């Protein structure tokens, strides 16, 4: 009986050594969410894009 326990313990120990330890994986980087075009009053100083009405007039409208 004792010999059986030793064999079972040795088999479990060998199996534990054979299986690689789990590696903690880092979380993937979050996908940035683009903000809409800010209101004209939030621009610093006079900007040519402050009162642009066209869709392609402002570089920020691409992300809207």
UniProtKB/Swiss-Prot annotation:
Q: Does the keyword Ribonucleoprotein apply?
A: no
Q: What's a single GO CC term here?
A: extracellular region
Keyword set, alphabetical order: Neuropeptide, Secreted, Signal
Where in the cell?
Secreted
Q: Does the keyword Secreted apply?
A: yes
**Cleaved signal peptide residues:** 1-18
**GO biological process per UniProt:** neuropeptide signaling pathway
Specify the propeptide location in this chain. Answer: 19-40, 63-64
Q: One GO molecular-function annotation for this sequence?
A: neuropeptide hormone activity
Q: What is this protein called?
A: Neuropeptide-like 4
Where does this protein come from, organism-wise?
Drosophila melanogaster
Lineage start = Eukaryota, Metazoa, Ecdysozoa, Arthropoda, Hexapoda
Annotated gene: Nplp4
């Amino acid at each position: 009986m004792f010999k059986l326990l030793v064999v079972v313990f040795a088999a479990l120990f060998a199996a534990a050594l054979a299986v690689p330890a789990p590696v903690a994986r880092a979380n993937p980087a979050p996908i940035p969410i683009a903000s809409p075009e800010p209101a004209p009053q939030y621009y610093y100083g006079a900007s040519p894009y402050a009162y642009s009405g066209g869709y392609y007039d402002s570089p920020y409208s691409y992300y809207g």
